[in-house]
């Protein structure tokens, strides 16, 4: 095990998210709306501390109390007097900044614990004594009660020798009911994260007064009801109003959204974002939406496996003002509720100011590429990623149909006519009743879907019309295609950092997906992709990847076409057995065959670069206007942003966090 895997290096990249100009252009009403939504998001984001690990909330409170008493600069003088070197003190600041940026002491991207150096992982979506089989039992119970797992946690208790399962719903209100299911007792309780949910509801109500239209008002009203009573149905209703709110200047979404970090793949991590539309960049995405129906017909599955109607979504480029949670993505396709996405629509967003800094690369830190590829990679990485994100979100996550039989027995497809292209026979399986993609495919659902969306991006970026939409033609267009595919191949190799050999588990959905794609392209053969182990200039193990750009449109396209069709067919037909066999097969990391991936993993760990952290601005009301408070791009700046973020009720908030953490402690001991 490589020790550095569990530390954040002192030279980690820390960048401020620039939203000054976007915020300046907002009207006074829009600024107030953005401010109160940001406050709701930041308080809700503290839930992630309690979702991440038993100790995260306690460490957060400790750091808040330290830095409220003394600024990072003042504390440095104290540290020097007790013998800490400047590098040691910086390491402390980086650790503190890392805890704030990840909302816990596990990396949000990869779920590796960082300092203290303990390799064994934990999750707080389930109490420490819950097994995977019990998670499956709980899912069956939730399905029977038509409850979604998104905003729940599961706790196993022993009451006088009798096993009892407590399902906690995140809400401001408390109480619910007791049920018997499969000879086991289940207690459903409201009130998880109660004081934090109260804060979220308070600020959402404040934001309502500054809503631009009725859709926004009704959306916030439903969100408040959801967070008050733990109702996923209310959150779904709010999401419907959110979809109808076309082209807002201030865009936001909040709730228990992504299930990447739940070991069972059903429970959502809290996140909330507030962002401002970048009109110039959004024009390109609008053109992509206009071409979507034509492009969807080019995807490699039969028409019956595509949605009956493509509901044209909003697709905008946003500059993030606030993103509260454990990490900031480059793009989002939401809501995640399949029933809404299939019949009512969704929205896509690309986070422009995140892209601008997250993927800036220094040549000397570019690993595993040939020297002649590095300058081209640096030049076209940004534009190629913009194309990939657009296709991934809109036509990746936005494509494909799920075959469903509802509670009344009605099917959304003709089971007597639809042929499975993989078997040549009639479709023989589908989703029934309350079954969803997440509940059915559970542990592989997130990564499998990310892989499908990434493959759509690779496949459709070969289309010249797509490239023209992004202003790319001729040699520039070909270079962007090459770098997009090369970037995916490299990302597949880098993904090995997020594989744990001891448990044979992947810790990050996107990186597992990219490794799977690397395996598919290597398997295609014919010299399309090369991967070899070499010795670096420093005399240490290294690796080099190559991609034959002359074979992307032939060998590469055919390989992705076949694989993508299989992914979609297994997903559409709820064929968990077939889908898992396919995906687990390509996800396996071994030391035999043409490539020793276990040894390559050690090389990747040796040469890995830490993921960047972001410093976000705060907003504060001064009289009748809202001010933007910005911070420097450093660990100290990131720390200051958090200590100033919760100044007004710091003592009560910290007491609430400690009480919530204490309440859960018996479940982990």
Specify the residue positions occupied by each region the protein language model found.
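Active-site recognition of the HExxH zinc-binding catalytic motif
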Residues: 27, 213, 385-408, 425, ...
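Amphipathic heptad-repeat coiled-coil/leucine-zipper-like oligomerization helices
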Residues: 54-163, 167, 519-571, 580
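N-terminal-proximal low-complexity accessory segments that begin disordered
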Residues: 2-68
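Short, glycine/acidic-rich hinge or "gate" loops at secondary-structure transitions
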Residues: 214-221, 235, 406-412, 466-486, ...
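Post-HEXXH active-site segment of zinc metalloproteases
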Residues: 400-449
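Contiguous, non-catalytic segments that form substrate-binding/exosite surfaces or channel walls
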Residues: 88-176, 182-385
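Extended, compositionally biased alpha-helical segments that mediate assembly or anchoring
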Residues: 540-669
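Long, well-structured alpha-helical subdomains associated
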Residues: 19, 48, 437-440, 444-451, ...
